[in-house]
Structure formats: C-alpha cells, structure tokens
Amino acid sequence: MMYSPICLTQDEFHPFIEALLPHVRAIAYTWFNLQARKRKYFKKHEKRMSKDEERAVKDELLSEKPEIKQKWASRLLAKLRKDIRQEYREDFVLTVTGKKHPCCVLSNPDQKGKIRRIDCLRQADKVWRLDLVMVILFKGIPLESTDGERLMKSPHCTNPALCVQPHHITVSVKELDLFLAYYVQEQDSGQSGSPSHSDPAKNPPGYLEDSFVKSGVFNVSELVRVSRTPITQGTGVNFPIGEIPSQPYYHDMNSGVNLQRSLSSPPSSKRPKTISIDENMEPSPTGDFYPSPNSPAAGSRTWHERDQDMSSPTTMKKPEKPLFSSTSPQDSSPRLSTFPQHHHPGIPGVAHSVISTRTPPPPSPLPFPTQAILPPAPSSYFSHPTIRYPPHLNPQDTLKNYVPSYDPSSPQTSQPNSSGQVVGKVPGHFTPVLAPSPHPSAVRPVTLTMTDTKPITTSTEGEAASPTATTYTASGTSQANRYVGLSPRDPSFLHQQQLRICDWTMNQNGRHLYPSTSEDTLGITWQSPGTWASLVPFQVSNRTPILPANVQNYGLNIIGEPFLQAETSN
C-alpha cells in the first residue's frame, strides 16, 4: 500500500514529529524491524534465521518504500513524545535540532522508578530501553536490546537514571571493540590496493582471518551509509513547511505560514487512533518550528506557557459516550480551549472564538432534527458542531432554565401539546439521553439508554407508597450504567423533576406487565439537574403519581428494541 502524507493521521503531523523526523537515521527502520523479524522467526520455528534468510530480510527492509519508513518513524516519535515529560519536550527538540546547548531531558519512569522500555510499535515481544532507542534513532548506532549496560551518561547529566538526551548518552568501548576496529580498518585498506598499504608488514596477520566470524549481515559500507543517511533523504517526501498539512491551532497565525489543511482529516484505513493535541508548538517566520531565543517568534510566549492555556490534555476520539453524559461543570469546563484571536485558514469566518475540542454528537436515530433539542448558542460565539457551552456559562444552569419544575402536591401540571410522540428505536449499543427542549411548554420524549436486552427486573425493596415524599435514597451498590441512584446529599438534586408516563413491556417477579387501558400504570420520573438524567420507577393511580418514599435497589431494562411513547401527566 502506498503511503503519502495525506494518508497519515493527524497525530503523525505534530510539530514535534515534523521537527525531529529529518534527524532520524535511516538505519533505525531496518534495524528495529530486522531484530523483530528474527525474534518472531525464532519463536515460530524454535531456531535462528540462517544467514541467507536474514540477508533477504535485510535487503527487503532496505528497499522498503520511503513513505512506509517515514510513517513508521512518525509513529515511533509520537510514542516517544508521550514518554518524555511535558516540560522537557521543547528542550529535547531544540537540542536534537542543534538550536540549543544539550541539556537533560527526563522521561516518565516506570512503576519501579526506572527508565521505561517500549516495544517499538509492537514489534514481536521485544522491548527496548528508551535511551537505547534514542541512540539508535538519532545517532545510527546499531545496538542490541541487551546493550543497555554498555550505555554511559555524560558527566554533565544531572539525572542519569531517567535522562534520554542523545547527546548525554555514550557507548562504552572495550579493548575488543578497539581491536576489531583496527582489524577491519586494516583489512579494508589492504583490499583497496593503495600503495601506502601494500607493505605486507602492515597487513593483518593471516591467523586473524580465522579468529573472527561476522555474525551479522551488514558490511561496513552498508552500516556507515544507513547510519549517516536521514530517513527522509531521497524519498521525495521531505515534509516542506509550506506543504505539510497541519492543524491550524499548531501554528501562530501571525507568522504568515501558508497552511493547507482544514480541521477535518481523512479517515484512516485502520482502527481509530487517539489524536493527542495537548501541546501547541509554533513555527517561526523562517519555517522553523522551534525558533531560537534570538528570533522574533521567541519574543512571545514559550511552548510551555502556551500549554498552560490548554487547561487539560485534549483528545479527540471516536464518540463512545452519550452527548449529555454524567458530567459536572468542573469536568466539562477545563476542556474548553481559547484559540488565538486570528483568522483560522481551515475555518472560514472564525474570529475571536472560543470553541471546545469535543467531538460532535453521533447521528441521532430520532425522526426529528437533534439540533432542535439543543439550546441555541449565543450569537457572539462561532457556530460550529463541536461548540458546547461558552466558558462563562454553567451547563447545569443552562439546561435547568429549560426544565419545568414539578410540584407533587399540585393536582394539575398539564402542558399544552400533550399529544403522544413516538421516539425512534433504541440501538443496542448506546443511545444518548436527550437534552431538554428549549421550549418549556413542549413535550419532550425521553430516550432510555440500556446496554443489553435482558428482561426488565424492577426490585423495589422497602417501597412505601407515599405521594408526598420528596426525599429518596438508593443503595451504593447500584449497577453502573443501568440506573442512577438518587442521593439526598445535594438539595438541588431534587429541585427540578418532571414526570412522564412511558408505555413499555416489563417483567416484574416473573410476570409480564403490558400497557393497559386501566388507570393504574407504571412510569418513570426524569430529573435533569444539569446534563444527566436519573430514572425512578413510580406508579400512577387515578391520574396521580405515587412516588416511592425510599428506593433502595431498583433497575430498569428495556426488552428488545421497544418504542417509547411519551405522554404528559397531570
């Protein structure tokens, strides 16, 4: 399959990766994958590769398409970026690119406080220490995964245990290594036939020919060539700054860099990946992503300062939760990101906007537009499908304004437009609980979210029929994602409530309950103190809801794929 920059996912175009990719040695792809192939072969056949098989694998990897090599290197750099502490990532790029004097770059330790080991993109079950990976990637030294004991840290290194700065890592050379280096040098010089080395006395003795056997498949010239060649050389895809498709919020809009990528990214052919964009990195007007301290771009805020604007790491994933999930305003407000007040090339007409990086809601199965359910956004904010709430508004207060209160003691709480409305089928995997309608007087259907299709079991131990009860308790052992327990700890929790009579097929204590024309039926209360709903079973007798005084254990489950018909209750 032909890979190109257009095929790569967004996380492979982070400026951290774009700045470091030209400094990755070409030997890294061949070396890591060759060791993985040898490991897989040994596990499968319980014997080592022959020299001919290993040489064939080496030639295959060396002749691999450049786009595949770059894609592999981009993914590995993205993985290494997460293993480096956030406050050291900028220093790492500046030192590797030669724009700053080498300093310590600390990595995140493992559970034992030692340096991490990674599998280099799940290549067999072989793991490599981070400092080994750095030496192979940026210095092109072909080390084995067991050569960690040969690595030594520079005397200037302040934390040798966790530092992954390539300039602080050296390889200890033993006497045997020096002897072999001299032997190989003399052997190559003797084969060159130059007059200066034609003296037989200077040639290596003949007995040395039988003393060493080369176990690898690389010769000296191949090793030198691939260790000195960047992985981006001769590929035709050298990631020029003017042609790199990048996210608009990675760049300073004052720099005048021509960006050609919009917010939307083409879908990947593989499994969905998490796109981590928790750090902003700015290019300079000259095209460098990391300006030197003397450049004009460095006079603004640093990368670490810009990270503070992003209150929390922002991840964009495939929607796996309901649009209005059980979240609090403290959980949702840090996700809002303030963008620079400049024109965004990927978004026409964006200016002075505050938008959230949450994913848009999934397609709604309802027969009416979902947009009509959401409260209208203020006109001073950019209208975008990912917009949630402005940072100065409380999501709970916003939704609470549209939920009419219900007084159990009031005999009538009728609402106009009380005709029943059929809600679409509930999917088996998930359906979000819908938000209240902007119009308080309108009838709003309630869609229940259930994870399986087992019969309904409603256990209401200790229920006492009391129509005037206003406080409910539920046991703490309630099953997650099945129902929500009410708690009297928060008085505002029971402030807003609305009763609905829902017709469904139930199974209680082994007998089926069907919707009947009698006056006694079952229903639920739907309380919305913010962005989530709690379901409480109740009974309606003579058009009067009878709420349980003490609900200890209860659960609701829909059978199959029912239709829920919402009606208003008096």
Swiss-Prot record:
Annotated GO CC locations: cerebellar mossy fiber; fibrillar center; nucleoplasm; nucleus
DNA-binding region ranges: 1-195
GO molecular function, one term: DNA-binding transcription factor activity, RNA polymerase II-specific
Segments crossing the lipid bilayer: none
Extent of Polar residues compositional bias: 324-340
Chief location bin: nucleus
UniProt organism field: Mus musculus
Phosphoserine PTM sites in chain numbering: S264, S292, S295, S312, S328, S333
Protein name: Nuclear factor 1 B-type
The keyword ATP-binding is annotated on this UniProt entry: no
Family annotation (InterPro entries): CTF/NFI (IPR000647), CTF/NFI_DNA-bd-dom (IPR020604), CTF/NFI_DNA-bd_CS (IPR019739), CTF/NFI_DNA-bd_N (IPR019548), MAD_homology1_Dwarfin-type (IPR003619)
Tissue: Highest expression in lung, skeletal muscle and heart. Lower levels in liver, kidney and brain. Very low levels in testis and spleen.
Pfam family for this entry, one: CTF_NFI
Binding partners and assembly: Binds DNA as a homodimer.
Compositional bias of kind Low complexity: 408-421, 464-474
Disruption outcome: NFIB knockout results in failure of lung maturation, and severe defects in development of the corpus callosum, specific midline glial populations, the hippocampus and the pons. GFAP expression is reduced in brains of NFIB-null mice. Conditional NFIB knockdown in the telencephalon results in significant enlargement of the cerebral cortex with preservation of overall brain structure and inter-hemispheric connectivity.
Motif extent (9aaTAD): 397-405
